[in-house]
Swiss-Prot record:
Quaternary organization: Monomer. Associates with the 50S ribosomal subunit.
Region (Disordered): 1-21
Keywords for the protein's UniProt record, in alphabetical order: Cytoplasm, GTP-binding, Magnesium, Metal-binding, Nucleotide-binding
The name this protein goes by in its record: GTPase HflX
HAMAP family, per database record: GTPase_HflX
Organism: Chlamydia pneumoniae (Chlamydophila pneumoniae)
Binding-site list for GTP: 236-243, 261-265, 283-286, 349-352, 374-376
Length: 472
């Protein structure tokens, strides 16, 4: 396996400073770490929403070490095919640049085409970054494991491939001292073709590495499934409080910081529910509006693995003005990955930031009905744990088992799986009450003496063992 590059200590904070070395700006006073951010919307009713979108774009830029000095938004029904931004707004941007001469970067809250990016840079004399490039850079700086690095580098390579001409255009201008900026005939075109071949080869190698990682994860999932421990995945919009909730439920020390994509690598921890039942909780990468398709494709296996857990805890920042949009972003991702929506518990987090009773009715009526919590203060956590317990019990067979003392190891196995509700010692047997998941029912069938009435339908207290009660 090839060596995987890992981000340096400075991470994406050095990205803004590195732009000066990568791009030749025409004016000395320009600083590529200072930017103008722009966003568009379809009609006047979206004007308030677009301001929230700009705030998110500013946070993305800040995570990359870029300071946004000025923002603009406007209605854009039909983008320009050549520059994305229409002529009138380009002239408005040029006036802004006169007012803020230090601005060296234009950030657009969309993914634009390579030709639009090149044409804008040539027209405005700025580095032009789209939303996708910012998100890719942040993911690159947050990736800590080999798997995450493979996924991010694969997404970056796919994004870079059609944009090599743009980078060579800047290099040729540097070599020619800024002149017309055209390619040196022959040399530049040959080098672009060589670079394209190298990038394609890198995509091929990274794809092969990712397939190997996916295979390893599938094997681990099989082992985990055979153990019969129920699994929950924490999903939701970035910065919604998933890692804080994981720490609270598992007494873990997962990295928590109030910034976008603080968690990129999935982390799994054991959680003990009321009554002693063990489950596994996995914290996953946060979603975001307009998540780049290259990233969705590269992280598809990671996202699918999360969505295929037994139950999803969909964590929503109830205090955010665009909470409903964040919910829809998650549901849209289900559709993009063509995944049927699994069992979900909607968790409205950060209710401590809201006045009592001020949670919008549209959030309260989300299906399934949400649990209100604060992962920071612990409010509502017992309600969440109780609901998790109920769901696990619904998916399990409530039974009594009789273990001869010669089979004590089987009892230990059930304890390790966290499915034992109680046990008592008798003269010839160890009598155990347990909730058996489907994965363990066939294995422990010989030891089951009773199935509880909620599972077998017998109204006479505890019922007899029924073959139809068991999984295949």
């Amino acid at each position: 396996m090839d060596t995987i590059d890992t981000p340096g200590e400075q991470g994406s904070q050095s990205f803004g400073n590195s732009l000066g070395a990568r791009f030749d700006l025409p004016r000395k006073e320009q600083d590529p770490s200072q930017a103008l951010a722009v966003a568009s919307y379809q009609n006047k009713t979206d004007s308030q929403v677009v301001e929230e979108h700009l705030d998110e774009l500013i946070s993305l830029a800040d995570s990359c070490g870029i300071s946004v000095l000025e923002t603009r938004s406007w209605i854009l029904k039909t983008p320009s095919a050549s520059t994305y931004i229409n002529v009138g707004k380009l002239e408005e941007i040029e006036e802004i640049l006169k007012e803020f001469p230090s601005i060296g970067t234009l950030i657009i809250d969309e993914e634009i085409t390579p030709s639009q990016q090149r044409n804008l840079e040539k027209r405005l004399g700025l580095v032009v970054l789209d939303r996708t490039e910012l998100i890719l850079e942040i993911f690159s700086s947050r990736a800590l494991t080999a798997e995450a690095n493979i996924q991010v580098q694969l997404a970056q390579a796919r994004y870079l491939l059609p944009r090599l001409k743009r980078l060579w255009g800047h290099l040729s201008r540097q070599k020619s001292g800024g002149g017309s900026g055209g390619f040196v005939k022959g040399e530049g075109e040959k080098q672009i073709e060589l670079d394209r071949r190298m990038v394609r080869e890198r995509i091929h190698k990274l794809s092969a590495q990712l397939k190997a990682v996916i295979k390893q994860r599938a094997e681990r999932r099989k082992v985990k499934s055979r153990r019969g421990i129920p699994t929950f995945a924490l999903i939701g919009y970035t910065n919604s409080g998933k890692s804080t909730l994981l720490n609270l439920l598992t007494a873990a020390d997962t990295y928590v910081e109030d910034k976008l994509f603080a968690t990129l690598d999935p982390k799994t921890r054991k959680c003990v529910l009321p009554g002693g039942r063990h489950v596994l909780l996995t914290d996953t990468v946060g979603f975001i509006r307009k998540l780049p398709h290259t990233l969705v494709a590269a992280f598809k296996s990671t996202l699918e693995a999360a969505f295929h857990e037994d139950v999803l805890l969909h964590v929503v920042d109830a205090s955010h003005p665009l909470a409903l949009e964040h919910v829809q972003t998650t549901y849209d991702l289900f559709q993009e990955l063509k995944i049927e929506k699994p069992r979900i518990i909607t968790v409205l987090n950060k209710v401590d930031r809201l006045p009592q009773g001020s949670i919008p009715m549209k959030l309260r009526l989300l299906s399934p009905l949400p649990v209100l919590i604060s992962a920071k203060t612990g409010e509502g956590i017992q309600n969440l744990l109780s609901l998790m317990t109920e769901i696990i019990q619904e998916k399990s067979l409530h039974v009594t088992l009789n273990f001869p003392y010669t089979e004590y190891g089987k009892f230990t196995e059930l304890c390790d799986a966290g499915v034992v509700a109680s046990s008592r010692y008798q003269e010839d047997f160890l009598v155990v009450e347990a909730y058996l998941p489907k994965e363990l029912q066939k294995k422990f069938r010989p030891f089951i003496s009773y199935v509880f009435p909620e599972d077998c339908g017998d109204d006479e207290g505890r019922g007899p063992v029924l073959e139809s009660s068991f999984g295949d």
